[in-house]
Amino acid sequence: MKRHGILRIFPFPFESTPMTLTELLIPTYRQMLQALGVWLRKAEAQVEDADALMAARLAPDMFPLSTQVRFACVQAYEGVHRLRHESMPPALEALLDEGRNGGDHPGTMAEALARVDEALAFLGTLAPDALDAGAGRPLELGLPMGLTFDLDGEGYARDWALSQFYFHLMTAYAILRNQRVELGKADYVQHMFAFLRPATAPAG
């Protein structure tokens, strides 16, 4: 039986093994939402009125930080529910509404951090194969403006779920940098330090 997944390539002499959708998406969602939490906590420590950051935007026609945080969380929830062919729960619809209303009601830094922590807690409950059955299933992706896309689970993960997740995540990062919060590449890829060869770490 063909195993759906994206190939995970190891240097010789290891053999290639397929990476399942769960192995691809859930660690990605978790490590990047953890990073988002770190960015927000750094902003909270550096900026006197951190709550004011929630209303900050990159451009007048873009959603504020408050919305970007919530929509990044939404993408993680939505990816899981769509790939398991589940209806979107009321709590997710409420989070979407909270994000859409971020311009008028940006909320507080503490509330934004709570949304990130809630999403991480949800991801932590998933089984190691939680999404795998959805890899080859047909999936209908409907958008509010009436557009509908027909994909399978793998195409949805590659072409929509990850790109949307990173869009909102990176917009949040860019807003914080634009507001002079001190962040760097190490804050963005902090998960990579788990793989750092000790002898290559900078001295000091």
Identify what each model region corresponds to.
Residues L33, G37-E44, Y77-V80, D117-G124, ...:
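Structural signal for well-ordered, non-membrane alpha-helices
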Residues M62-L96:
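Conserved alpha-helical segments that form or flank metal/cofactor-binding pockets of metalloenzymes
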Residues V47-A55, G124-A157, V189:
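Acidic interhelical loop/turn segments
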Residues H4-P18:
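Short, Lys/Arg-enriched N-terminal segments with co-localized hydrophobic residues
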Residues E154-A199:
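C-terminal or internal capping secondary-structure element at the end of a domain, subdomain, or sheet
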Residues L24-A35, F71, A114, F167, ...:
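Generic recognition of stable, solvent-exposed alpha-helical segments in well-folded globular domains
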Residues P18-A52, P60-S66:
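Generic N-terminal segment detector
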Residues E15, M19, I26-R30, P89-L92, ...:
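Mature, function-bearing regions of proteins
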